């Protein structure tokens, strides 16, 4: 079992943790989040980005992690970036607790997300269905108010 965690910080009140667990290279990865301080009653995009670089805030994280050269999509789509995790839903206080299992996110192997950045976006991910070029790259999920580098945990 490999475990990893990212502590979310940024230029906003959004804080939280995102944890990753994978039993072995062929198993799906469970991604869990506990996020506070976001917009109330909203759906917000969450993605793994290419770089573990936050020297210039969350913009330094680069584009979505996309080792197979695909276009942006929903987590359930065959055509998607590895880093495409879709949206999470916040409650009336702007908090979100949840989890998802994903078959493309890996902690083990050549396409590992370790050392990369998880980004929480200010807008809703349109899952690549927005009808424009930006939708096929980012899901039109908007600015990056919080992020954290994914690192090995106990």
UniProtKB/Swiss-Prot annotation:
* Keyword list, A-Z: Antioxidant, Copper, Cytoplasm, Disulfide bond, Metal-binding, Oxidoreductase, Virulence, Zinc
Q: List the disulfide bonds.
A: 58-147
Q: Which Gene3D superfamilies match?
A: Superoxide dismutase, copper/zinc binding domain
Q: Name the top EC class.
A: oxidoreductase
Q: Where is the composition biased (Basic and acidic residues)?
A: 126-137
Q: What does this protein do?
A: Destroys radicals which are normally produced within the cells and which are toxic to biological systems. Plays an important role in the phase transition, and may be important in vivo, as it would facilitate the intracellular survival of the fungus by providing a non-toxic environment in the macrophage phagolysosomes.
Quaternary structure, from the entry: Homodimer.
Q: What is this protein called?
A: Superoxide dismutase [Cu-Zn]
What's the encoding gene here? sodA
């Amino acid at each position: 079992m490999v475990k990893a965690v990212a502590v979310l910080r940024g230029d906003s009140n959004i804080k939280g943790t995102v944890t990753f667990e994978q039993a072995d290279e062929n198993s799906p990865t469970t991604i869990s989040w506990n996020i506070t301080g976001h917009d109330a009653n909203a759906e917000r995009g969450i993605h793994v980005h290419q770089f573990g670089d936050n020297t210039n805030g969350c913009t330094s994280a680069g584009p979505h992690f996309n080792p197979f050269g695909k276009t942006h999509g929903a987590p359930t789509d065959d055509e998607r970036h590895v880093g495409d995790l879709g949206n999470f839903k916040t409650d009336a206080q702007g908090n979100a607790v949840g989890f998802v299992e994903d078959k493309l996110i890996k902690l083990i192997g050549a396409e590992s997300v370790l050392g990369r950045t998880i980004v929480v976006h200010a807008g809703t991910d349109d899952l690549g269905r927005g009808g424009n070029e930006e939708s096929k790259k980012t899901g039109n999920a908007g600015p990056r108010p919080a992020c954290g580098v994914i690192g090995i945990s106990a």
